[in-house]
């Protein structure tokens, strides 16, 4: 047995330590200050406790400033929360408490569920425990001991967890002072290293193991950060997100609603449907000349889905359709389509295709349905029925790179038109389980890697790029487009996916220049992804203050006095003739009341007309969110607003025509 271990440090230096030396020993050998700051170590990239003996490999000393420390801080905070709960409410059972995105939670079994009023009490107790600065220590228990100890404590959920751990796997128990829990670890050195930048966020119900047949538990969510400034910033973003919640704004703006009889499907109101159609019309114009817009059936025989493979691996997420009545002559099983690609392949296959016709680009604003658990549904962001701005390009292998670049240019241009300038494009490469031979993947990944470099180069570095190893679809590599909104949240929207699978499954081919049947390359492409979700993102990004060209109601003409009503109607008609969507408000109400009311529904422009404006044939323009009013002539107002209400793609075409004439 070796009497020493060899450790390689980030600077490349190599040191030897006695066998049994811990991470803390290594940190202390470098400096006392580093040992004081250290919270954990990483050996060959795997984070471990400071108290754990080190082994040969590459070592890193992790401090609270390290990004990896954040997960440890949150993990430890979850344990401290559990201890606080059991100190305050003895007899409460602790179940599972993982770190999640932006925080942590713990599920508790308690006779009476927790309420939001309990959270400040728990936080206060957590601060006491953190101040005690008790060390985290690890023990390895036998299965029998763990079951006996937890059973004696009345922790039946822990006993069940112990039973679920595979035979031969260590049962780790972490102590913080006298309190302990079953946990894989790792943890920091002591509770004091958590700090005070934490907050408990909310309580919710949760079934044990996520199964509705099991008992209902109470889940407490929390978050924690290394620094108070980071916590404050996160809470500020949450507050902003709440103000921008598209579900609330959708109600206030009278855009849409959901109801129990149609879970996960949208009831579009007049104004909401107008925005939706504005989005569709814009996307349709962007496809002109390059794409054939098609429409594949909503309901198809399951045999098609068996051929595509969806029936085997996606059936539980599909809505099956049965024929009404027992005496029908068609007893086949049908399903609502969860995606558009199999239908588009049928359209491509209808009739012989020559290489001279490629690329063939088929686009559809296709209504699809996918089963989502009711607990996962979230306004427009997560629904069961939605519209995909889907397209499938059938091309030759040689055309693949050019098509991917063409798609990229379109996607980035669309995002820019809606005000999204920070976009990240990432290439997802081959997963472990995949179809197609390595030569196909090598070729596709090589082409897409070059495309990725071109994307970054052409943008002058404005568009960030990256690689997601192993994250590709099983049928081919893909690009993922992630945009950043006004408050810094990231939304993955667009995708470009190369597919080796479906053309082969469906026997799609074209006739090449040698009169041979050749399988085409199929590229799946979506820009918005789900049109409903993209609209939800837009509403939240703009906090309901939609650009004039997107807004469902662009102008309200409001009069100060009934003497100006005639002129107000003339103003409204002139604006309508210029192509704007206009309503009038001639009610016998004070003008400030009218302005407040229309501001709640997020009308972008209110034109105020009084006796003076009628005499001068002028208007006062008041913008949403501004107290100021701008006076101008009616003709100036019409010219200015009609220009602003023109979609950006239409403006570009006009400018291009003018430049051509000039």
From Swiss-Prot:
Positions of region (Catalytic): 245-547
Organism: Rhizobium rhizogenes (strain K84 / ATCC BAA-868) (Agrobacterium radiobacter)
Protein name: Threonine--tRNA ligase
Residues holding Zn(2+): 341, 392, 524
Major location (coarse): cytoplasm
UniProt keyword Repeat, yes or no: no
TGS domain: residues covered: 1-64
EC number: 6.1.1.3
């Amino acid at each position: 047995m070796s009497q020493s271990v060899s450790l390689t440090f980030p600077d490349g230096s190599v040191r030897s330590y006695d066998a049994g030396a811990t991470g803390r020993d290594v940190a202390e050998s470098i400096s006392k200050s580093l040992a004081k700051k250290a919270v954990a170590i990483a050996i060959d990239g795997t984070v471990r406790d400071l108290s754990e003996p080190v082994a040969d490999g590459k070592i890193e000393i992790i401090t609270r400033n390290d990004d990896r420390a954040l997960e440890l801080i949150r993990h430890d905070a979850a344990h401290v929360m559990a201890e606080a709960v059991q100190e305050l409410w003895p007899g409460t059972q602790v179940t599972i408490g993982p770190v999640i995105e932006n925080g942590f939670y713990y599920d508790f079994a308690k006779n009476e569920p927790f309420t939001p009023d309990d959270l400040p009490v728990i936080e206060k107790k957590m601060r006491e425990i953190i101040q005690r600065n008790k060390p985290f220590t690890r023990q390895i228990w036998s299965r029998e001991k763990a079951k006996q100890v937890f059973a004696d404590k009345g922790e039946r959920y822990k006993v069940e967890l112990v039973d679920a751990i595979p035979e031969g796997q260590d049962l780790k128990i972490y102590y913080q002072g006298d309190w302990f829990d079953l946990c894989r670890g790792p943890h920091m050195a002591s509770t004091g290293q958590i700090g005070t930048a934490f907050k408990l966020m909310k309580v919710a119900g949760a079934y044990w193991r996520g199964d509705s047949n099991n008992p209902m538990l109470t889940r407490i969510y929390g978050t924690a950060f290394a620094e108070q400034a980071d916590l404050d910033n996160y809470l500020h973003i949450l507050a902003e997100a709440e103000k921008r919640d598209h579900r609330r704004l959708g109600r206030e703006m009278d855009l849409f609603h959901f109801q129990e009889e149609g879970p996960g499907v949208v009831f579009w109101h007049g104004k909401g449907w107008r925005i939706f159609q504005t989005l569709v019309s814009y996307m349709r114009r962007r496809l002109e000349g390059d794409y054939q817009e098609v429409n594949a059936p909503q309901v198809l025989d399951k045999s098609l889905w068996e051929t595509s493979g969806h029936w085997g691996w996606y059936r539980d997420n599909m809505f099956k359709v049965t024929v009404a009545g027992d005496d029908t002559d068609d007893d086949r099983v049908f399903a609502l389509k969860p995606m558009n690609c199999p239908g588009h392949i049928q359209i491509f296959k209808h009739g012989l295709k020559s290489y001279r016709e490629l690329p063939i680009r088929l686009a559809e604003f296709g209504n699809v349905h996918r089963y989502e658990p009711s607990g996962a549904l979230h306004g427009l962001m997560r629904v069961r029925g939605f519209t995909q701005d889907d397209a499938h390009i059938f091309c030759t292998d040689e055309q693949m790179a050019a098509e991917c670049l063409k798609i990229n240019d379109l996607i980035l241009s669309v995002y820019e038109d809606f005000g999204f300038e920070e976009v990240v494009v990432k290439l997802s490469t081959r997963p472990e389980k995949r179809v197609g031979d390595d030569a196909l993947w090598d070729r596709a990944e090589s082409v897409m890697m070059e495309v990725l470099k071109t994307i970054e180069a052409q943008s002058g570095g404005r568009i960030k790029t990256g690689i997601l190893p192993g994250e590709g679809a099983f049928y081919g590599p893909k690009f993922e487009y992630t945009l950043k909104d006004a408050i810094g949240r990231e939304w993955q929207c667009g995708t470009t996916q190369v597919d080796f699978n479906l053309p082969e499954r469906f026997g799609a081919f074209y006739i090449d220049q040698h009169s041979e049947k050749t399988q085409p390359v199929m590229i799946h492409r979506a820009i918005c992804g789900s049109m409903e979700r993209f609209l939800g993102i837009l509403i939240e990004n703009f906090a309901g203050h939609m650009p004039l060209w997107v807004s469902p109601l662009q102008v309200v003409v409001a009069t100060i006095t009934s003497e100006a009503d005639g002129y107000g109607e003339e103003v409204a008609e002139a604006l309508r003739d210029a192509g704007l969507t206009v309503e009038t408000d001639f009610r016998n109400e004070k003008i400030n009341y009218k302005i407040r009311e229309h501001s709640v529904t997020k009308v972008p422009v209110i034109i105020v007309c009084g006796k003076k404006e009628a005499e001068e044939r002028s208007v006062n323009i008041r913008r949403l969110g501004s107290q100021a009013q701008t006076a101008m002539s009616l003709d100036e107002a019409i010219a200015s607003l009609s220009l602003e209400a023109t979609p950006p793609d239409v403006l570009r075409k006009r400018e291009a025509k003018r430049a051509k004439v000039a």
